A protein has these predicted regions:
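Membrane-embedded alpha-helical bundles that constitute the cytochrome b-like, heme-associated redox core
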Residues: 1-122
C-alpha cells in the first residue's frame, strides 16, 4: 500500500500547485530583473556582477532555476504521457516513454547542477 506522502506528491493536485507556485516565482524573478534594468539604465558589467554576487540574489536565481526545471518536467511529463501511448504508437510506447522521460530527467538534473556551478561556483 502506498503511503499518503507518495499519494500526495504523485497527485495531479500537487503537480498543479507546484506549477502555480513555480509560475509565481518565475514571474517575481522576471519583475526583479526588469526592475533592475529600468531603475539602473546604465548599469555596468561590474554592477551587475556585484548584484548577482549577493547571496540572496543567488538563492532567488537558484530557486527560479528549480522552478523552471520543475515546471518543464511536469509539463513534459504531461505531454509525453498524453501522446506516447499504446493507442497512438503501439506496443513499444511504454519503452519509448521511459526513454524520453529518462533522457528528460538526466538533462534537467544536469541543468540544475550546472546552475549550481554557475551561481555558487561549486
Amino acid at each position: 500500500m502506498k503511503s499518503s506522502f507518495n499519494l500526495l506528491i504523485n497527485s495531479g493536485s500537487a503537480r498543479w500547485i507546484v506549477q502555480r507556485i513555480g509560475g509565481v516565482v518565475i514571474f517575481l524573478y522576471a519583475l526583479f530583473i526588469l526592475w533592475n534594468l529600468f531603475v539602473n539604465e546604465s548599469m555596468s558589467y561590474f554592477e551587475w556582477r556585484q548584484l548577482f554576487e549577493s547571496k540572496i540574489v543567488k538563492f532567488f536565481s537558484w530557486v527560479t532555476v528549480f522552478s523552471l526545471i520543475s515546471h518543464a518536467w511536469i509539463g513534459m511529463h504531461c505531454v509525453i504521457s498524453d501522446y506516447i501511448t499504446v493507442r497512438l504508437i503501439g506496443p513499444k510506447a511504454l519503452v519509448i516513454r521511459k526513454i524520453f522521460m529518462s533522457t528528460l530527467t538526466v538533462i534537467l538534473v544536469v541543468y540544475f547542477l550546472w546552475s549550481a556551478l554557475i551561481l555558487w561556483g561549486l
